[in-house]
Each structure stands twice: as structure tokens, then as C-alpha cells.
């Protein structure tokens, strides 16, 4: 029989199979910004893991727009997906109220108030505190932060880690926090504001990859040098270490592991297992971008 199937080039009709099993063999994935490097790497790894278990994915990019997010979730439901993996814009968990109660769901990079989903997170607050301590340990006291938008879970957690470390060191100054909205342009504008403020800043901590790129563009454009003029810690290495001198100290998230774990948590729910949360550890990689100051 197998030989006959191979000779005929038979391909199983998954739609017909789905009608029998009441499964579409498809997982819906909803991302706020697919152009974001963070999202792209996670989705790629997630797809590989789900494919190994016979599932395809249907990806929606909601462009950080809550209305598009709602429309996209309704679209995924209409396609009868077997589960959803979402990077929610909001942390209130209300977005999941749009879905059937029994639909397996996983939230990435956000801790929501919903008890009906599993979560995959990193130790945002702890790793940001460690990065900030690296700067204070090198004698820095005027440390600027380029943060994401207020109210976004990851941005808030990373800011809190920075604040806690500086409060312990006795040098916290809220005026040194600049919002960069997790985009290259946002990082660029925030860094230019810091450089032009002349407020004694000697070090900068940037809390995502796109803003890190934007901040470095601004530093180069204004003729400043790292670490001679400003010590610098960025977020996520990706290709930075290959193209930038000196090597930038960075907080590196386990992006591929995040994707794998998100897929695993969803597969567990599809198998009838209980929801659970996973917190992964990011790493702080030293570079040559932090100097000692007296």
C-alpha cells in the first residue's frame, strides 16, 4: 500500500482530514510588528517546532494597532485554527476574551491578567538591573535609559530593573529616562535628545534591538565615540558585533528558545495538559563599550 501511495504521488487532504477530526492542523500567530527582528526570529523557530508536529501556521501582523489586533483574532477564529500564539499589545488579557474559552492560547513577551493562557517571558527586570549595575560598577552615576512606551509590559519591567539598580546605588534621576517606542527612529530621536541635553550623562542603556541601532546611528552622526564619550549597553546582539567597533555590551534574549517554548506550551494544551508559564533567562554579554570613570 505504501509503495502504491508513493508511486501515485498521493498527498493527504488536510482539509478533509480536518472535517473528520474537527482540527485544522493550523496555529494562528499574532505579532504586533513582524518587521521587528525579535518577532521574526521567534516566529521562525516557532514554525519549525510546530512543523515537526505536523502543524502549519497562519501569521497576522497587527502593526501595534489594537483594532487590527481584534480584527486579526476574529480572522484567525474564522479560519478555525487549533490554537493561537499571541504577542499582545496590552497586558490586560482582554484580547483573549474575543476567542472561544476552550481555544488553546499562549502569550509571548507579555504577562497578561488572563488565567486562560500560558506565558513565555524573560527575566526582564532582573537582567535590566544587572546591566545597569555593570555601569554603576564602572563608576557611572549619570546613566540615561532609552525605554519603550510606558504601559507596555516589557518596557515597564526593564525600566523598573534600571530604576531599582540606580535607587540602590543612590543615583536615580527620573529625568534621564527617554522613551523610544521600540523602533529605530525612536532610539535615534531619544539618543539625540540625550546627547544634546548636556546634563552630565556618561552612560546609556538601551532596552531593545531596534532602539539600539537607532541610538548608535545618532551617536555616529553627532561625531561622538563609544566608550570615550559615552559608555553604552544595548539589547540583543544579532548582527551588531559583526559591524560595529568597539564590540557593544548587550543584553541577549534567548529568541530561538522563546519560539520553541511557545510552540511547546501550545502543543501541551492541544494534548489536554494544564496551562503553565515559563520565564527564560537573558544573558548579559560584556563588550568594549563600557569604560571606567572616576
Regions found by a protein language model. Name each.
Residues 6-7, 45-56, 71, 77, ...:
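Bacterial carbohydrate/catabolite-sensing allosteric modules
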Residues 8-75, 79-83, 160-163:
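Amphipathic helical "hinge" segments at domain boundaries
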Residues 29, 86, 206:
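Redox-cofactor binding/interface segments in oxidoreductases and associated redox assembly factors
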Residues 32-33, 89, 148, 289:
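Residue-level recognition of strand-loop junctions within catalytic nucleotide-signaling folds
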Residues 63-66, 87-92, 210:
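Short beta->alpha connector loops
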Residues 81, 86-87, 145:
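Short beta-strand and adjacent tight-turn residues that come in two discontinuous sequence segments
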Residues 91-100:
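Active-site-adjacent beta->alpha loops and helix N-cap segments on the catalytic face
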Amino acid at each position: 500500500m505504501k509503495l502504491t501511495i508513493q508511486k501515485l504521488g498521493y498527498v493527504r487532504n488536510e482539509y478533509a482530514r480536518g472535517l473528520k477530526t474537527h482540527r485544522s492542523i493550523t496555529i494562528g500567530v499574532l505579532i504586533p510588528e513582524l518587521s521587528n527582528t525579535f518577532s521574526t526570529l521567534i516566529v521562525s523557530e516557532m514554525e519549525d517546532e510546530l512543523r515537526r508536529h505536523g502543524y502549519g501556521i497562519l501569521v497576522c501582523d497587527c502593526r501595534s494597532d489594537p483594532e487590527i489586533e481584534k480584527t486579526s483574532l476574529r480572522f484567525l477564529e474564522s479560519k478555525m485554527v487549533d490554537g493561537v500564539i499571541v504577542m499582545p499589545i496590552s497586558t490586560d488579557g482582554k484580547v483573549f476574551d474575543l476567542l472561544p474559552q476552550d481555544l488553546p492560547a499562549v502569550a509571548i513577551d507579555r504577562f497578561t491578567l488572563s488565567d486562560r493562557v500560558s506565558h513565555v517571558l524573560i527575566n526582564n527586570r532582573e537582567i535590566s538591573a544587572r546591566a545597569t549595575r555593570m555601569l554603576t560598577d564602572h563608576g557611572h552615576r549619570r546613566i540615561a535609559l532609552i525605554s519603550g512606551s510606558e504601559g507596555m509590559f516589557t518596557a515597564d519591567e526593564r525600566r523598573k530593573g534600571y530604576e531599582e539598580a540606580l535607587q540602590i546605588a543612590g543615583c536615580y534621576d527620573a529625568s534621564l529616562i527617554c522613551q523610544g517606542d521600540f523602533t529605530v527612529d525612536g532610539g535615534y530621536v531619544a539618543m539625540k535628545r540625550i546627547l544634546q541635553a548636556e546634563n552630565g550623562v556618561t552612560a546609556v542603556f538601551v532596552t531593545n534591538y531596534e532602539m539600539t541601532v537607532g541610538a548608535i546611528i545618532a551617536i555616529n552622526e553627532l561625531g561622538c565615540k563609544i566608550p570615550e564619550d559615552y559608555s553604552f549597553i544595548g539589547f540583543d546582539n544579532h548582527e551588531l558585533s559583526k559591524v560595529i567597533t568597539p564590540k557593544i555590551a548587550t543584553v541577549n534574549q534567548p529568541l530561538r528558545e522563546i519560539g520553541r517554548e511557545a510552540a511547546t506550551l501550545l502543543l501541551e494544551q492541544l494534548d489536554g495538559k494544564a496551562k503553565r508559564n515559563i520565564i527564560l533567562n537573558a544573558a548579559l554579554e560584556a563588550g568594549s563599550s563600557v569604560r571606567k570613570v572616576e
